[in-house]
């Protein structure tokens, strides 16, 4: 059986991403309250409110440009349509979230907020290599945590980014954790 865990019993982490004592407040999709989700103004507003932890998702265009964007399609929140993975950056860069804000590059998000921690959900298999490359170029491995609903994507990110990368549990890890609590 698993014993109850309290904040006092959780050991300090050797992961810089987890250097915050207590619960971690995240600005999901940039904390989009007054600004369009996953846009630079949304992230700026969240940081301005004191959030140290941001959350975004990663998708990649047909020509390999890595975006900080939730959906795999432009349709829901932009003034354009189409599957991001099937469109070149030259087309996607014209899309405006809520008709106003451009979709940010993941690299620009990481560069704009060097003191922020960023939880990145790799939403598609094709995003993994591009995210790893962005982390390498920006030197941001120590201030991100990679999440995914795919164990294979998490494993690939660990292989590409190295042992210093913080990752969440994948579905199998969550199942093992939950199963262990019923012993």
Give each language-model segment a name.
Residues 2-183:
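Phosphate-group recognition and catalysis centered on beta-loop-alpha active-site segments
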